[in-house]
Amino acid sequence: MTIKRGVSLYSYQDEYVRGILDLEGCIAAAAAQGAFGIETLAEQMMPGYPFPGAPDLPDSFYDKWHDLMSQYGTTPTVHDMFLDTKRYTSRPLNHDEMVESLQRDIRHTAKLGAQGIRVIVNTPPEVVEAAAPY
């Protein structure tokens, strides 16, 4: 088995936020460093994700994503989900909203073509259990 390099797009957060790199630029930079695998963070680099009550990202986004993966010889490996429990200033997310958010991340991960999802530490186990059959 050959070990291959993977890079989290989180590594490029500074360049992305300051406008030095866009999503494609981050992927290109990772590929230039010899990365094959790409870990994604939708909230950070995928515009419109995840606005409450908004539909999933459009198919055109995923078409462009797969074109970029092909162009740079990379592959999505894992999606790093972030459960924004403080999305609303007046209250925390309730259980059903957290499950819905995780289900959206599961759909997103599948559409990206990633094989896994990394659930962050603040995601309650009962939310993961409720979303797992999805």
Regions found by a protein language model. Give the residues of each.
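Active-site acidic/histidine proton-transfer and metal-coordination neighborhood
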Residues: 62-134
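Glycine-rich, proline-tolerant flexible connector loops at the mouths of alpha/beta enzymes
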Residues: 37-69, 122-127
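Catalytic domains of carbohydrate-active enzymes, especially glycoside hydrolases
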Residues: 22-45, 111-113
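Short, solvent-exposed loop/turn segments at secondary-structure junctions
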Residues: 12, 45, 83-84
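Hydrophobic faces of well-ordered beta-strands that scaffold small-molecule active sites
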Residues: 3-10, 38-40, 76-81, 117-119
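Short, solvent-exposed loop/turn segments at secondary-structure boundaries
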Residues: 16-21, 50-54, 89-94, 128-130
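Boundary/entry segment of secreted carbohydrate-active catalytic domains
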Residues: 1-22
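Residue-level recognition of alpha-helix initiation/capping sites
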Residues: 20-21, 59-60, 100
